[in-house]
């Protein structure tokens, strides 16, 4: 019999921390799917390293969420023993890898946000979150540089690479707005100086994205309509497939030891 999902006491700080941890875990898992399949060996290593950076961020955030919650949940339980509706990650990060251009555009959109986010979170009044932010910002800065180089290389490359990258931008753009939204519980943490106002990051994010997209001879969509729902547990079918693979061992053999 499969292991049942855990119950989580979602106080504002626990929920806020889990949302960021879920972003990192899900996107890190997506990048791990490229292992052995990247277009060149060097990029195979780069994608794996970025995935490991994100996994490290997820572990620290899950551990802190468990400490704050105080009900015995830890990083493994949060990762392996929650169902789809309990995950609160952005819809952007759960989107399938698609081709290499699609993966790079998704990573670029997220990394450009994460770099600004972690830089701002270094000023959080929560000492644990500010410490996690200091480490994560250094990693995110590298991710932005790496992805920016690929955006320009692909966009200003061959006719096919340009077309594939533009298609990826068009497909993923509607998932970017969710990064800058907040609910009442998050706004309360902003007021307390624990969280940061994500909406205030959008102008800086848009400048970074617009500059790189322009340099890559690509274009951003004109639509303002955005997808949302991930932060409240309403996900695409893609996350269910991802979690089925990610959680299969622990769900089938709970507490297994090697």
Predicted segments, located by residue:
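A contiguous pocket-lining binding segment that forms or flanks enzyme active sites
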Residues: 128-191
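Amphipathic, well-ordered alpha-helical segments in soluble domains
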Residues: 23-31, 57, 61, 110-117, ...
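Conserved alpha-helical segments that form or flank metal/cofactor-binding pockets of metalloenzymes
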Residues: 51-81, 147-151
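Alpha-helical scaffold segments that form or flank carboxylate-/histidine-based iron centers
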Residues: 12-17, 38-57, 103, 128-140
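Internal, conserved structured core segments that host functional sites
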Residues: 92-146
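Acidic/His metal-coordination segments adjacent to aromatic residues that form catalytic metal sites
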Residues: 2-15, 81-107, 157-158, 172-195
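Helix-loop segments that flank and shape redox-cofactor active sites
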Residues: 27-49, 114-129
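Extended, helix-rich structural scaffolds rather than catalytic motifs
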Residues: 163-258
